[in-house]
């Protein structure tokens, strides 16, 4: 084991000098004597000096402290012992339940599966959320992104998906909280405990109050645990909240590492850093990883480099819209902006495809007619257009749905709607079977049968 000493400290970044014949490799983990702090080597600057990122607070660290090289990258516990536990970026338990007792530790830096090992499937994953199952269906072993600005419901949608999929799906899940609020992490833990699925979930948290090193690596820690389950031949669910904070942590340390900023101040290595993470989140012939990632959209601008870089890696994109949220329609998913590779008649069947496209067509037509209605009023429209507007307002309300995870706030019980019922409901509205029902009957309900019941009471 070689040792060196600290020569410079700039926030989360430190330079350490080693003898020239024993310079650590890039990504090696270093430990500081007498301190509970791990450093990760990022660059070799020459003359035996390496530049490192601290995986924790650098308070009280000074020049001259002795640093030991562990000669291996950061490794974390993997396997079934991690289930039901909360860990930090280094795999240390933070739930006060004693040591993890793992049988195996894996390095958080691993190469992505080769092209020959990868596999894809067309099997659909039912979520029980009408708007998702209809217009942007998820594939088993696929990657999904939830895009949205501040406060439109990314985390709530994510929680509902976890609840519906993790409870219906009997496999294991891994949740990585990357740079989000500790309160949300806490709520999530209690939600999982109350639903009795905590013993099937591994939780890894690196929250917003932590140094950038933790937030930059915590996604890799969670991913490593998911990869272990996948390589054992299981179907794993991998949830990340929030991918944007992973990019942001990279931006925070990028300038300190001496790189020139690129577009909008992001790191020049943005696409590569995103690729390193996303290329590993994939399904192989042994097992699958189905991932759901929340992506914060700065200032509601989807062309910002960070969300724009994420788009290209995904199979389905769910876009949350502030305009829809302001109408009081939750989940605030935009059915015209959200897309999925699975929306193909060969994959989902002709009926589902026709209903989904029919819904989008009616909503798009309503969008075009809005200006005319605003200027001239409804009376100036043709009978056909009036019918389209009425149906599209019903569809818009029928796309809303009470969530299980929001029961405490809304007071109305959550609803899980099967794909069959979803298609039947929207098909009925498009075919005019429910033209006589008032539009309020379609708001915040589950299946179409509830609309008929609700209309009787109105």
From Swiss-Prot:
**Subcellular localization:** Cell inner membrane
User: What is the top EC class of this enzyme, as a single word?
Assistant: translocase
Where does the protein principally reside? membrane
Q: Name one GO molecular function term.
A: ATP binding
The catalytic activity of this protein is classed by the Enzyme Commission as: 7.1.2.2
* Keyword vocabulary terms for this entry: ATP synthesis, ATP-binding, Cell inner membrane, Cell membrane, CF(1), Hydrogen ion transport, Ion transport, Membrane, Nucleotide-binding, Translocase, Transport
Which reactions does this protein catalyse?
Answer: ATP + H2O + 4 H(+)(in) = ADP + phosphate + 5 H(+)(out)
Q: How is this protein annotated for GO cellular component?
A: plasma membrane; proton-transporting ATP synthase complex
Domain of life assignment:
Bacteria
Q: How does it sit in the membrane?
A: Peripheral membrane protein
Locate the residues binding ATP: 148-155
What Pfam families does its record include? ATP-synt_ab, ATP-synt_ab_N, ATP-synt_VA_C
- Say what the protein does: Produces ATP from ADP in the presence of a proton gradient across the membrane. The catalytic sites are hosted primarily by the beta subunits.
**Membership in a protein family:** Belongs to the ATPase alpha/beta chains family.
HAMAP family of this UniProt entry? ATP_synth_beta_bact
Tell me, how does this one assemble? F-type ATPases have 2 components, CF(1) - the catalytic core - and CF(0) - the membrane proton channel. CF(1) has five subunits: alpha(3), beta(3), gamma(1), delta(1), epsilon(1). CF(0) has three main subunits: a(1), b(2) and c(9-12). The alpha and beta chains form an alternating ring which encloses part of the gamma chain. CF(1) is attached to CF(0) by a central stalk formed by the gamma and epsilon chains, while a peripheral stalk is formed by the delta and b chains.
Protein's name according to its UniProt entry:
ATP synthase subunit beta 2
* Species: Marinomonas sp. (strain MWYL1)
């Amino acid at each position: 084991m070689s040792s060196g000493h600290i020569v410079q400290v700039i926030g989360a970044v430190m330079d350490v000098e080693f003898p020239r014949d024993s310079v650590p490799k890039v990504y090696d983990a270093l430990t500081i004597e007498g301190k509970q702090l791990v450093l990760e080597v990022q660059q070799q600057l020459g003359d035996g000096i390496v530049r490192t990122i601290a995986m924790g607070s650098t308070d009280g660290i000074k020049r001259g402290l002795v640093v030991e090289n562990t000669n291996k990258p950061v490794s974390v516990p993997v396997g079934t012992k991690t289930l039901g536990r909360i860990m930090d970026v280094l795999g240390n338990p933070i739930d006060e339940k004693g040591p993890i007792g793992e049988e195996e530790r894996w390095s958080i830096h691993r190469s992505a599966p080769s092209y020959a090992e990868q596999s894809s499937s067309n099997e659909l994953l039912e979520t029980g959320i009408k708007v998702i199952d209809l217009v942007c269906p998820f594939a088993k072993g696929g990657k999904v992104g939830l895009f949205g600005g501040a406060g439109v419901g990314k985390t709530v949608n994510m929680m509902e998906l976890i609840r519906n999929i993790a409870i219906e799906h009997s496999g294991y899940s891994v949740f990585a909280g990357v740079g989000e609020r500790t309160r949300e992490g806490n709520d999530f833990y209690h939600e999982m405990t109350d639903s009795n699925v905590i013993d099937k979930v591994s939780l890894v948290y690196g929250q917003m109050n932590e140094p950038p090193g933790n937030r930059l690596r915590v996604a890799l820690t969670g991913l490593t645990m998911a990869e272990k389950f996948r390589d054992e031949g299981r179907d794993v669910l991998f949830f990340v909240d929030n991918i944007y904070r992973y990019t942001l942590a990279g931006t925070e340390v990028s300038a300190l590492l001496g790189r020139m900023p690129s577009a909008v101040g992001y790191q020049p290595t943005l696409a590569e850093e995103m690729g390193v993470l996303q290329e590993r989140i994939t399904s192989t012939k042994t097992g699958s990883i189905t991932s759901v990632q929340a992506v914060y959209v700065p200032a509601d601008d989807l062309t910002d480099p960070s969300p724009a870089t994420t788009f290209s890696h995904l199979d389905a994109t769910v876009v949350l819209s502030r305009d829809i949220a302001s109408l009081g329609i939750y989940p605030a998913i935009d059915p015209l902006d959200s897309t999925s590779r699975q929306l193909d008649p060969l994959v989902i069947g002709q009926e589902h495809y026709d209903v989904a496209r029919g819904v989008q067509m009616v909503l798009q037509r309503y969008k075009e007619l809005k200006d005319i209605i605003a200027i001239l009023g409804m009376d100036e429209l043709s009978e056909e257009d009036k019918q389209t507007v009425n149906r599209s307002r019903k569809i818009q309300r029928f796309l809303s749905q009470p969530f299980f995870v929001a029961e405490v706030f809304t007071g109305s019980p959550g609803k899980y709607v099967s794909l069959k019922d979803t298609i039947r409901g929207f098909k009925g509205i498009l075919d005019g079977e429910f033209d006589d029902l008032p539009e309020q009957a379609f708001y915040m309900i589950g299946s179409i049968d509830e609309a008929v019941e609700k209309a009787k009471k109105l």
